[in-house]
Amino acid sequence: MRHGHPPTDIHHGINQGEPMDDNVLRVGIGGPVGSGKTALIEALVPVLIERGHRPAVITNDIYTQEDAQHVRRTLAGVLEPERVVGVETGACPHTAVRDDPTMNLAAGAEMLERFPDTDTLLYESGGDNLTLTFSPALVDLFLFVLDTAEGEKMPRKRGPGITESDLLVINKIDIAQYVRTDIGIMEADAHRVRDDRPVVLTDCLTGVGIDDIALYLESRRKVLI
């Protein structure tokens, strides 16, 4: 039986509807512009496939298919290009994944109809601010991606994306020293404002931390699916 997120408060933008009762884990991936959401997907998909999963990807951009095209190019030979679909939202990113996820729900349903073997559906939001969350009608859980270039102060700014996401990802740890970010402080503050809910440090370009994310998703799959 699927559980997903419980009914949520104003920060989530309450959305009607129950998640579908199937064996697909639906994962939202949000975060600011340039934090590495697309890079995370491109690093995570091969690991999921290697671990026996059958992922598909739905990206969100306001006006273009840029992220979907990038994912297809990067994962050529790894993931069938038809398993990557871009949604042009024409609106603020949080609208399409939280307030009115109709377009994404339709894209997901079409993807599952076309590829019924899919067991993991990744929804990438367009870049947004710290208030971004996902509708429980759309996803079972969501990840929020920060990066060290934004500064070690970011976790202390809180916001629902940081405090309420199921998993917080701190990306680009490889450049922390060059942008004068103390990873230790950033990670400690993240744990503190999240009441010790999980935080993963990643370098998506080299794969550091990606196995930890895959293991986390598998652990949640056992509970949610």
From Swiss-Prot:
Single GO MF annotation: nickel cation binding
Keyword Chaperone: yes
One example of a Gene Ontology biological process annotation: urea catabolic process
Major localisation: cytoplasm
Record-given protein name: Urease accessory protein UreG 2
Source organism (scientific name): Streptomyces griseus subsp. griseus (strain JCM 4626 / CBS 651.72 / NBRC 13350 / KCC S-0626 / ISP 5235)
Keyword annotations: Chaperone, Cytoplasm, GTP-binding, Nickel insertion, Nucleotide-binding
Function description: Facilitates the functional incorporation of the urease nickel metallocenter. This process requires GTP hydrolysis, probably effectuated by UreG.
SUPFAM superfamilies for this protein: P-loop containing nucleoside triphosphate hydrolases
Intracellular or extracellular location(s): Cytoplasm
Protein family membership: Belongs to the SIMIBI class G3E GTPase family. UreG subfamily.
Binding, GTP: G31, P32, V33, G34, S35, G36, K37, T38
One Gene Ontology CC term in the entry: cytoplasm
Top-level lineage group: Bacteria
Quaternary organization: Homodimer. UreD, UreF and UreG form a complex that acts as a GTP-hydrolysis-dependent molecular chaperone, activating the urease apoprotein by helping to assemble the nickel containing metallocenter of UreC. The UreE protein probably delivers the nickel.
The keyword Cytoplasm belongs to this UniProt entry's keyword annotation: yes
InterPro entries the record matches: CobW/HypB/UreG_nucleotide-bd (IPR003495), P-loop_NTPase (IPR027417), UreG (IPR004400)
